Amino acid sequence: MNQKIWDLYAPVYEKAMRLDRRYYQYMYDRIPAQISGKEVLEIATGPGLLAKHVAHPTKRMVATDYSEGMIREAKKGSYPAQLTFAVADATTLPYPADSFDVVLIANALHVMPEPELALAEINRVLRTGGLLIAPNFVGHGTGILSRICSKLLRLAGIRFEHQWTESEYLHWLQTHGWDVTFSKLLPSRIPLLYTECVRSYAWTEEEMCDIMTPTNRNL
């Protein structure tokens, strides 16, 4: 999706998220225990709302977004000292291999044309035994409210490249090398599937190249 769209919506994005605050509260309550004492990378942080709520027990947390406008918004206000914000593209992360214990990417994979590229980078920077937390919208258009919200977002220029159902999203993660250890469906305006994953096994470079071939990208 065009970076300029996210720059445009950066000043109002947090206000829109507040409409689903009670469902985000579930993540605010659960995630800190999963990342306590860990080095954490967040991808697609947006205005940093999730990062600011969960970073306090971490050893270090880096929250990134490829929109400079979003990062400018994220840096406003107060947040834990161990939290930093940076501009970074999820498909070409500027971090060495095995840099983080946990990677968090919330509500972003479905708007990426090739989310497999982001998964490959997550696989690269995540340490052995690390955790991927990947909540994502599922079931677009399955209910009246969901259909209305999806249509409004499309009119605003925010396009869903992938419209997974709950089972399709879980299958997609599995076919790309991740075992889902925990999931919970949250009935927000567009249903949100909270997921925690670990690698199904250590992928070799050859296997990662195979997973990235065009014929396999939409599995």
Listing of model-derived features with the role each one plays in the protein:
Residues 41, 45-92:
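Class I SAM-dependent methyltransferase SAM/SAH-binding core
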Residues 91-102:
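A short acidic, Gly/Pro-enriched loop at the edge of an enzyme's catalytic core
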Residues 16, 20, 133-193:
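C-terminal alpha-helical "lid/dimerization" subdomain adjacent to the S-adenosyl-L-methionine
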Residues 102-114:
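A short SAM/SAH-binding and catalytic strip from SAM-dependent methyltransferases
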Residues 1-35, 49, 53, 73, ...:
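Conserved class I S-adenosyl-L-methionine
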Residues 116-128:
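A short glycine-rich, Lys/Arg-flanked "PGG" loop and its adjoining helix->strand segment in the class I
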Residues 38, 59, 101:
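Conserved acidic residues
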